[in-house]
Amino acid sequence: MENILLGIVQGLTEFLPVSSSGHLAIFTAIFNKTPDVGYFAFLHLATFLAVVIFVKKEIFEIINGVFKKDEKYITLSLKLFVSMIPAAIVGIFFEDFIKSIFSETFFIGVFLAITGVFMLLSDKMDKNLKTITKIPYLDAFIIGIFQAFSVLPGISRSGSTLFAALLLGVKKEDAVKYSFLMSLPVIFGAGVLEMQKTVITKEYVYGFIVAFLTGILGLHLLKKMVIAGKLKFFGYYCFLASLFVIFYI
């Protein structure tokens, strides 16, 4: 039962801007049990697959465009690479150090509140100027910096990158697509690097399926909420989660 519940938590919170790491802390406190690292990594692969399904059209267009030497898609792929650089550097060299300092529940609560602020501000941004192929290199790097912040427990990866993209004037639907295209290597890497010597059990498979299905649901829900300008509701939720973490965990 706990494995299934963790699959639901991972599938939804990996994509909804409420911080999967913050909710992992809540899960750990409620059940007084830290989830197995290998199992959590396996769930990352489920959410990776969910993203691939969600942006399959864009992935095909980019790959096809690169092979056809279409400058627009070659440039887009390079910008996505630029966006991945900050998270890669932080993840490789500083992740363990950062988490060792900021893994206390007080900090998790504070960072959840910051994610909430991001969501409230995101709803007020409606420039809708840039499509996914018109994002400048500098903007791509800035969005990448915000993605790197998500190494802090309680900072939502999707929330921070959406906030940055909308702040920089990217169209809402394109901000969602770009956020999840640039997340693919991060999610896949998180799964593969920590799955070494993991024995996959029947319970793991059940959790994988649940995480995949709830991940698909979470992706479509987020897209609708962004377009409808209702990210503030995620912000309110983050504030409540922040208070719960600070005062009850």
Swiss-Prot record:
Subcellular locations according to the entry: Cell membrane
Principal location: membrane
Source domain of life: Archaea
Coiled-coil parts of chain: none
Membrane topology listed for this record: Multi-pass membrane protein
InterPro entries: UppP (IPR003824)
Gene Ontology cellular-component terms listed: plasma membrane
Reactions this protein catalyses: di-trans,octa-cis-undecaprenyl diphosphate + H2O = di-trans,octa-cis-undecaprenyl phosphate + phosphate + H(+)
EC number(s) reported in the record: 3.6.1.27
GO molecular function: undecaprenyl-diphosphatase activity
Keywords: Cell membrane, Hydrolase, Membrane, Transmembrane, Transmembrane helix
Pfam family, one: BacA
Membrane spanning stretches: 11-31, 35-55, 74-94, 101-121, 135-155, 175-195, 208-228, 229-249
Family: Belongs to the UppP family.
Cited function: Catalyzes the dephosphorylation of undecaprenyl diphosphate (UPP).
Name of the featured protein: Undecaprenyl-diphosphatase
